[in-house]
């Protein structure tokens, strides 16, 4: 399965920062992923079924959690799920306890496409605002001031075309050439989505 967001420059930057240990203990992370396709989905009989936005956008968010933290044993639960304009869910919030705590929100009702990621930690915070395809995309790191105060921050702003598909395709070709295949990620994502969907009873 192609989860191309892993190749977003700021996703790679966030992963490197998390793995560096410079942030200290990671307390919690929240992500929002929204687009404005509710009417398109409603007009498509095969798309406006089942768990709706959950597998559509939620799969990318859960994959991002795996990419950042590599935790395949994490369990998610539904917090909020709505059908504002669609037969299937057009808004979902799911969460996961543990370290760090995770909150993921996805919707088809964000009329301007948008993505955010906020990581709050012992030594500060790190933030992604938007994706390259919707640009500009900004990565911001804030360093905590003790005992309190406005933190100094450093930002990197990218205005460019979406580089992820070409990078993902190059990665795919390298896997084909080496014969290395691992379905653990896909199994984990599908299991998490099914568990959340089943907890809503869908009907």
Which residues are covered by each model-predicted region?
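Short glycine/proline- and acidic residue-enriched helix-loop micro-motifs
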Residues: 48, 150-157
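Active-site loop of classical SDR/Rossmann-like NAD(P)-dependent oxidoreductases
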Residues: 156-170
């Amino acid at each position: 399965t192609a989860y191309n967001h892993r190749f977003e420059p700021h996703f790679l930057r966030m992963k490197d920062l998390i793995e560096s240990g410079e942030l200290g203990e990671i307390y919690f992370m929240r992500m929002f992923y929204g687009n404005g396709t509710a009417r398109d989905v409603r007009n498509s009989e095969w798309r406006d079924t089942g768990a709706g936005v959950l597998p559509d956008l939620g799969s990318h968010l859960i994959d991002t959690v795996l990419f950042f933290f590599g935790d395949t044993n994490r369990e998610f639960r539904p917090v909020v799920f709505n059908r504002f304009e669609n037969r299937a869910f057009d808004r979902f919030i799911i969460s996961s306890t543990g370290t760090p705590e995770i909150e993921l929100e996805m919707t088809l009702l964000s009329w301007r496409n948008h993505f955010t990621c906020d990581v709050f930690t012992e030594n500060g915070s790190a933030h992604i605002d938007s994706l390259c395809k919707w640009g500009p995309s900004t990565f911001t790191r804030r360093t905590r001031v003790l005992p309190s105060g406005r933190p100094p921050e450093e930002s990197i702003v990218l205005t460019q075309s979406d580089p992820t598909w070409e990078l993902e395709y190059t990665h795919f070709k390298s896997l084909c050439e080496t014969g290395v295949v691992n379905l653990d990620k896909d199994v984990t994502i599908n299991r998490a989505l099914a568990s959340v969907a089943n907890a809503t009873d869908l009907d």
